[in-house]
Amino acid sequence: MASCQKLISRVAKNSSASCKHQATSGKPQARHNSQVYIKPERIIMKTSEALKLVGGLSKPSKMPGWAYGLPAKECKTGSRLVKVKGSTCEGCYALKGCYVFKVVQEAQYRRLKSIKHELWTGAMALLINSKKSKWFRWHDSGDVQDEAHLMKIFAVCRLTPETKHWLPTREAWVKHFISMAPANLVIRFSAPMVDQAAPASWPTTSTVVTTGRTCPAPDQDNACGDCRACWDPKVRNVAYGQH
């Protein structure tokens, strides 16, 4: 309950800022020390403006760094798998607990809408760089929406070279674009069914198993600790224990 209260407090703060931004969004207007400059090769804005534009980041207690979440209900493949018995999406954690609170849902949908903003890529990169974190997880809730979204994620990763990015996905079409992914991004295809073998056609994957897990989190207070396997391109597959 305490963790939920912290999450709601953080989301509420970001939501307030995001709403103010949306109310004044549109063509950038000159303001003292808060003007957004747009040039062909770069975008410059204040960190506070970037936060308002993208709708905030999340800070999962288990993770060593920051994350970014979208509505799980809007997962293209996951929204179908959640109805399938024995799938890795059955009983999805992002569809219960703190995630179902109205303030969290509203914040996630604002983030989803903001992806189409022309300044989203630059704002995300600025925000991630401002955290000075070595590790970032995409979509602790939700998934890649389409090719345009994926290309924007690639661009954000290139603009944050000091950060290692991890993108788990159940969208099989993403495989066609793996060769375009920047070196600091690891894309892991998540096997759709529990105890299903990792597909050999993907360079990096994750699976959910009833026995033989490799993720150490359950043995260390449900936290990553010093493990960074999910971000390591040399780790072929990460096996999570079934919840």
What does each of the following model-derived ranges do?
Residues 2-15, 19-20, 37-243:
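Class I S-adenosyl-L-methionine
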